């Protein structure tokens, strides 16, 4: 028991980090009414600024040179030829946090203030993708280590327990309590704090009293980004710095912020510290002999924030504060697919052209785009038609990929794997069917909270679910087999005696897989068209528009949500199995939450309510038909897609496919005018 208590004490440090991030989320929500999914990235970028200043004396700005050559945009400031001390680096990082606060308010959340909730979500996700990709481009994706600013030293045998805890962890928790308590007093006693509370209660009422909502939002965003950046710097003493790791710290921070009802900075602080304590203590139970091996330590750690978020959402539900609800009826358009047969014909023509004239690289890109299109169709059903913002569709695909591979394995060593993958050796069609069914079951499990919540709150649940499921299922060697955490080889698939793939050591051409994937894409398009044009599609759109009105018309809202998630999960599962066939070796990083967010972002760029939008997003997907070959080019493309996603949220939430709407409107008007003239001539 003493070991568990010691681990709980060690969790105070990371809990302090969660607490400050959660406090930043609460402050941003009080000022703008937005739950910021970008909070972890706002801690990550100043932390990289601190590390870079310590190592090289360079200070990078959160942009890059978009037009190298004719117009040189400064993106780096060299303050010293070598690294500088901790204090100048700390001040530079805090200054960077202030810059981020100004940019976030002026360029993103300020213009989105009177936009519908879906646009705010798109903008928040765009900022997350932009900062994460930009950090990977400027600083690299490898782990960075540097001495922080907190004093060194260890408190040996605290409270008579064996072991020790760093003073840095205790100090970070203490700083979190000071920040949380100080902000609680600030919002109760200061003039700006009282004005913030007035705007928070009623934006219209506060505006009528003469308070500037924009000014109040700016002040609160500056506070939020500053304390978040400070947290990112202080946590460097015991947290490994990578773009992905820091960005995903937003998940436990969201759980702590919800503990404070998104309104109380003090309760969010307490929730963050308790969450860190519970996570660390729970990991100690996995070291016991009686603990089941199929529940890994990291999976349990990631499941705790998910459980906290689900419990809070279920108990509080619609009582959680949501601003901007008067714009909730504005949803991206989801028109009936009219020219879908033309689209299918174009897909067949492109496939034939690539089969006969394309290189092996082009064939691989076509396969990637085809699979991405199926995955994005799953999001079209759930997000575009049903109106439920799910960020876990790629996770559903990963579940199907891993479990179908395990079910098809027979104990042989496949490909370049160093491990024999044990399994029942089921035929590939049956293994695929079972893998998709399991993905549907996982999707329905994640969909249960959607019965009670929706919008950004559901996005929070699905994001936490994606993080937890990745570790519990895909990273679980007891469930998946050896190689789950590194490289898991896929058994060569055979369908009715036909080899779907070819050994890469023999040939890079994969004509059979191209035909196989295109057939599945055509089937999925046909299914989605049938859903949209049928009774099910009308029910989905009714639920998306107004759940209460749909219920009054006899629509089973809960059943419609579960059905939508089931269909979307099935489509995602198909995409996952096809990805396994293509890659032949599965890596857990392919299916993480950030990759899933990137997939959804490309769909938003194309048009989330359109089948054609899924096709546009699939063309833009990494390693797709319109991708670049260099890794640097891929990162820059992802960064640009994040910036473009923000622009889409502000100016055109229907996506790039809606750019043709004015042309279609003019053509329709021209045809109507011509028809009218012909009618008049006939009458004469």
Predicted regions and their residues:
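Hydrophobic alpha-helical bundles that form the membrane domains of multi-pass transporters
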Residues: 182-239, 243-244, 248-250, 257-260, ...
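Glycine-rich phosphate-binding loops of nucleotide-dependent enzymes
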Residues: 34-37, 202
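Non-cytoplasmic
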Residues: 24-35, 229-245, 258, 573-588
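Transmembrane alpha-helix interface/packing and boundary motifs in multi-pass membrane proteins
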Residues: 25-35, 239, 255-264, 378-388, ...
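Alpha-helical membrane-interface segments at transmembrane helix boundaries
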Residues: 5-13, 109, 131, 162, ...
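N-terminal transmembrane alpha-helices
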Residues: 4-18, 22-23, 40
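Transmembrane alpha-helices and adjacent helix-loop boundaries
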Residues: 17, 40-43, 47, 63-66, ...
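Short, strongly hydrophobic alpha-helical membrane anchors
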Residues: 1-5, 69-76
